[in-house]
Curated annotation (Swiss-Prot):
Tagged with keyword Nucleotidyltransferase: no
Assembly and interaction partners: Homodimer.
Name of the protein described by the UniProt record: Histidine--tRNA ligase
Recorded GO MF terms: ATP binding; histidine-tRNA ligase activity
HAMAP family reported in the protein's UniProt record: His_tRNA_synth (MF_00127)
Family, as annotated: Belongs to the class-II aminoacyl-tRNA synthetase family.
Reactions catalysed: tRNA(His) + L-histidine + ATP = L-histidyl-tRNA(His) + AMP + diphosphate + H(+)
Length: 426
């Protein structure tokens, strides 16, 4: 009987063992950095009430209109696989009373879902790392988030390959004033607009500035600038932010048509972009969203955050040939030729793990010839092969072969192995 193979859903990719060590390195780099800054992890459901995203992201957005995985459950309730993390994070904070006269610095990591056209660096299930700071006013916290990003890029090795772009969306009344100016401008060029932009013109014209249609880019660049209608308070806030970037030595450029693709943003917004992935690509984006908590039924609460897609980070590191550098942890492969040697190998492996917690120790438990085991050892990426053959067992010695150099193989007493590793791998 021929059985059809079931494959992964289009745009939802498997991450295989050859890549997971690099993914783990990227994830752990993020986590270590945020812990050093005093941020704490929060976890919330992958599935939420659909209204959560319609209310926060905005109904006239590509995400809500075209990209959300929405369906009715067995009770007839409309639920949605989360397309982004901020709304769920804020919902959890409100529901569990985390914002009552408190400040929260939080991070999260997990899968998000959008029914987009799959392409390089963009998938229907993608992994997002998010950072949110709630209950904190002023530009200092915005500057801290930018500093976190810069440290992440440095730790991952590509700080020279990304650029920071910033803008201000001002207060809601300023955006409303700008909206009228923008609509008038766009109506004067109505014949140029694509169907999506025409549809957005009355309901959410700022979305036109977020269009990726290459035929509209000149029109967008020539559009009136929101920054020109900002009031004194918004100008002062943005100037304070820019001054802080200069004090911290963080290069930036002001992008006057930078708007975030989600309705809840206001005041400072930013993106980190790179030209290493073909056309200019955004690898991280964020900004201030002081109205979001109130949108969801909470008390007015200042908030700011950012998010980045791990697939895009992986792709950038791959392009810059940084993946091997991220996977250079020292490891050892123990070769054992028979049952007695395998038992000795298991004992030795535990001893090494106890004495050297940072070392990865791989033990061959299936026996086999030396040639096949050396192939396995080399393929594993191990630095050293520890060999326990019949001669070694008889003499209670272990032979050691450096798999990455031409250094001659040596033998030492088994009791000296931890001392040897301490010196050799220092």
């Amino acid at each position: 009987m021929v059985v059809d193979k079931i494959q992964a859903i289009r745009g939802m990719n498997d991450i295989l063992p050859d890549s997971t060590s690099v993914w783990r390195f990227i994830e752990q780099t993020f986590i270590n950095c945020l812990v050093r800054y005093g941020y704490k992890e929060i976890r919330f459901p992958i599935v939420e009430n659909t209204q959560l995203f319609k209310r926060t992201i905005g109904e006239i957005t590509d995400i809500v209109e075209k990209e959300m995985y929405t369906f009715n459950d067995l009770n007839g309730d409309s639920i949605t696989l989360r397309p982004e993390g901020t709304a769920g994070c804020v919902r959890a904070c409100i529901e569990h009373g985390l914002l009552h006269n408190q400040q929260q610095k939080l991070w999260y990591l997990g899968p998000m879902f959008r029914h987009e056209r799959p392409q390089k660096g963009r998938y229907r299930q993608f992994n997002q790392f998010g950072v949110e700071a709630l209950g904190i006013t002023g530009t200092a916290i915005e500057l801290e988030l930018i500093s976190i990003c810069r440290r992440l890029w440095t730790d991952l090795g590509f700080s020279q390959s990304v650029q920071l772009q910033v803008n201000s969306l001002g207060e809601i009344n300023e955006r409303q004033k700008y909206r009228s100016i923008l609509v008038e401008y766009l109506r004067d060029h109505f014949q140029i607009l694509d169907e999506d932009s025409k549809r957005r013109l009355d309901k959410n014209p700022l979305r036109v500035l977020d269009s990726k249609n290459p035929d509209l880019q000149q029109l967008i660049q020539n559009a009136p600038k929101l920054i020109d209608v900002l009031g004194d308070d918004s100008r002062e806030h943005f100037q304070s932010f820019c001054n802080g970037l200069e004090t911290l030595g963080i290069p930036y450029s002001i992008n006057p048509v930078l708007v975030r693709g989600l309705d809840y943003y206001g005041q400072t917004v930013f993106e980190w972009v790179t030209d290493q992935l073909g056309s200019q690509a955004t690898i991280c984006a964020g900004g201030r969203y002081d109205m979001l908590v109130e949108f969801l039924g909470g008390a007015p609460t200042p908030a700011v955050g950012f998010a980045l897609g791990l697939e895009r980070i992986f792709l950038l590191m791959e392009t810059l040939n940084l993946l091997n550098e991220s996977n250079n942890k020292q490891s050892i492969f123990i070769i054992a030729t028979n049952e007695e040697a395998i038992l000795k190998a298991l004992v030795m492996a535990e001893s090494i793990r106890n004495a050297h917690p940072s070392l990865d120790v791989i033990t061959n438990t299936t026996g086999g010839g030396f040639k096949s085991q050396f192939k396995k050892a080399d393929k594993s990426g191990a630095r050293l092969a520890l060999i326990l053959g019949e001669d070694e067992i008889a003499r209670e010695y272990v032979s050691i072969k450096d798999l990455r150099t031409e250094i001659e193989q040596i033998s030492i007493p088994m009791t000296k192995i931890n001392e040897f590793l301490q010196d050799y791998l220092a």
